[in-house]
Amino acid sequence: RSGYIFVRRSVMFPFLESLDAPVTTQSCDQRVATTVPTQALQMMNSHFVNEQAGLMARTILHDHAGSPGAQIDKVYWRALSRPPDRAERKDCLQFLRMMADDHRQQLSGDNLSEDELASTIEARALEDLCHVAFNLNEFFFQQ
């Protein structure tokens, strides 16, 4: 979603290379539209995307902790520039509950206080939702 980014001709960003970035050492009057398998894999698994999902989740939690409905609204506004519809909201609430249950099981052996456990679970579930939002077709392709 970036129109311009500063790039040194001799140093390519590995993330952009996987998205079939142009060769910066040659001029090009026109680029052909391409889709390569690594694009989807980078968006699903890359460290960069996971970091961005975590940053977005922390930002949203700062203002909307304990309010899943408001969190879902904010995720949709930030990722897609629109509110979720009723079905999407329902699916997201179900997803947050499911992820919270998974994270609760994963953290069950840790020595966390109840408050720490609850906030960690909420943060991780919301991070998962942000990651999902980054992988929606609507995030990649404008209608």
Region locations from a protein language model:
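A short secondary-structure junction motif
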Residues: P22, H47, M99-Q106
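Short, charged low-complexity intrinsically disordered segments located at boundaries
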Residues: A70-I72, R104-L107
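Extended, well-ordered alpha-helical scaffold/bundle regions in very large, multi-domain proteins
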Residues: P83, A87-R89
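Intrinsically disordered, low-complexity acidic Ser/Thr-rich regulatory segments
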Residues: G109-E127
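Surface-exposed patches in mature extracellular/periplasmic domains of secreted proteins
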Residues: A87, S108-G109
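An acidic, gly/pro-interrupted, aromatic-rich
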Residues: R1-V75, A79, P83, A125-Q143
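Amphipathic alpha-helical segments that form the core helices of the histone-fold
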Residues: K90-D101
